[in-house]
Design a protein with these regions (language model features):
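Hydrophobic alpha-helical membrane-association signature
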Residues: 32-35, 84-87, 117, 190, ...
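Activation segment of ePK-like protein kinases, specifically the conserved APE
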Residues: 24, 180, 256-257
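Terminal peptide-recognition signature
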Residues: 17, 21, 36, 54, ...
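Glycine- (often His-adjacent) and acidic-residue-rich active-site loop
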Residues: 56-94, 140, 223
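Conserved CoA-thioester-binding segment of acyl-CoA-metabolizing enzymes
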Residues: 1-55, 93
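C-terminal alpha-helix plus adjacent terminal tail
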Residues: 1-12, 47, 59, 167-173, ...
Length: 257
């Protein structure tokens, strides 16, 4: 599904999702969140798509957060705020637990809800000009437990508190240092770098990737909620597969699998 503000396509086993609202730095409305859910569910069912890349149009922003021009309609009362928050939390959870690897390709501003979205992806790759911020403290906004926990888990408690309490922006180098992003590349090579990175993942054994993704999800749960039986089953499926037999033989024969 593609809409005016949410674009999607697939190429060589990689699904691409673009936030297409560049005149507002790709600020997101309820309609865009709804479209994202539909696209993700379509990509989930498509067996030819093995990796997902999310990015923002225009070359200035990944996603700058909620569309403030829509606040009177979407976040002007307690009821509408609860509805909006419920919607975004559902999207974040869908992305965080997505069964295929997800990559946020960040070029420019990654702010507020855009950062919340990015940290739900497995991998974040940004250009040198990228800027990150969580301006809630300047806007009197509140974030739920899950959003704050993700930042604590990724950045560490001290850096996450500094980041949230001051609402200061950090640059790409700082983001790399604190683990907010995994790769930092020049702007003119970003698209090709991410394309090759995604292709590398898509060419690896799908059962192993699926197992590692799901086991990673279980690791981040509270210990009492982890499905360790599922983890063992996923690992066993890998060893029982034809992919494993071929990979083992290729290794022994010193040839590509």
């Amino acid at each position: 599904m593609t809409t005016e503000k949410m674009l999607s396509r697939s190429e060589n086993g990689v699904g691409y999702i673009t936030f297409n609202n560049p005149e507002k730095h790709n600020a997101v409305s309820i309609e865009m969140w709804d479209a994202l859910v539909t696209i993700l569910n379509d990509f989930k069912k498509n067996k030819d798509i093995r990796v997902i890349v999310l990015n923002g149009a225009g070359g200035k922003s990944f996603v700058s957060g909620a569309d403030i021009s829509k606040f009177d309609k979407e976040r002007s009362s307690k009821e509408t705020v609860l509805n909006y928050n419920k919607k975004t939390q559902m999207v974040y959870e869908l992305l965080e637990t997505f069964p295929k690897p997800t990559i946020a390709m960040i070029n420019g501003y990654c702010i507020g809800g855009g950062l919340n979205l990015a940290v739900c992806c497995d991998i974040r790759i940004c250009s040198q000009k990228s800027k990150f911020a969580m301006p809630a403290a300047k806007l009197s906004l509140g974030y739920p437990f899950s959003s704050i926990k993700r930042l604590f888990d990724i950045m560490g408690p001290g850096m996450a508190k500094h980041f949230m309490f001051t609402a200061d922006r950090i640059n790409a180098d700082e983001a790399l240092t604190c683990g907010l992003v995994q790769k930092l590349v020049p702007e003119d090579t970003l698209v090709n770098f991410v394309k090759e990175y995604a292709l590398t993942i898509s060419k690896n054994a799908p059962l192993t990737i699926r197992a590692m993704k799901q086991i990673g999800i279980e690791i981040l749960k509270n210990p009492d909620d982890r499905d360790l039986v599922l983890c063992e089953e996923l690992a066993s499926v890998c060893f029982d597969s034809e992919d494993y037999k071929e990979g083992r033989n290729a290794f022994m024969e010193k040839r590509p699998a």
